[in-house]
Regions:
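Extracytoplasmic/secreted envelope proteins and their assembly/folding machinery
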Residues: 2-9, 44-48, 77-80, 121-124, ...
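Hydrolase catalytic cores
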Residues: 8, 28, 32-33, 57, ...
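Catalytic-core regions of hydrolytic enzymes
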Residues: 36-56, 67-70
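Terminal peptide-recognition signature
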Residues: 4, 18, 59, 83, ...
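Sec-exported extracytoplasmic/periplasmic mature domains
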Residues: 9-13, 23, 49-57, 64, ...
């Protein structure tokens, strides 16, 4: 989370560390990951609702996965619908599995709602410094929205340090930062 927050909103031009994309953006940190394993879907749904009820314009979720039990998907789908109603953009990075998401379903996704596709939902994969998709990223002609820079991104790190990060999380943070400039 620290590196993503730095990509999005680190103070610009202060001579320290890195420059965030939208340094006027406010970060609302909500922990939904238990530390090991996958995030609890109930906690994800509650965090989405909390964020939109407290003014979040952009929500950056953890990576998609295929482990959403059917009975629990509705919790997240309903929370995403609430975010859509309140005008919040939801950004989710893909997993690094080299899987065609048009053939294998990953969650959350824009088609989770039975009453139609979500219009506020963006799925992001990582590209390299030349703009090419990274080799192990998931892909999909209809399920992936865009590729964004996600390799060797210099950002804040724990303990008042800085380092380079690579992955879908860096790409999705880049998109969230640009979205914050537009909002």
């Amino acid at each position: 989370g620290v590196m993503k927050a730095g990509v999005i909103a680190a103070k610009r031009d202060n001579g320290v560390g890195s420059n965030g994309i939208a340094d006027n953006a406010e970060i609302m940190t909500l922990r939904i990951h238990p530390g090991e394993g996958e995030p609890y879907l109930k906690d994800m749904a509650l965090a989405i609702r909390y964020a939109v009820n407290h003014g979040a314009d952009i929500i950056l979720l953890p990576e998609q996965n295929s482990l959403y039990p059917e009975e629990q998907r509705q919790w997240v789908a309903d929370a995403l619908k609430e975010a859509e109603k309140k005008g919040a953009l939801v950004i989710v990075p893909v997993w690094d599995l080299s899987v065609d998401m048009d053939k294998d379903e990953f969650f959350p996704n824009r088609k989770m709602r039975k009453d139609g596709e979500l219009t506020n939902f963006m799925v992001v994969a990582s590209s390299d410094k030349n703009g090419n998709p990274v080799l192990n990223t998931n892909y999909g002609a209809t399920t992936l929205d865009l590729y964004a820079p996600g390799t060797d991104i210099y950002s804040s790190y724990m303990g008042d340090t800085y380092q380079k990060g690579t992955g879908e999380g860096m790409a999705s943070a880049t998109v969230a930062g640009v979205a914050a400039l537009v909002k």
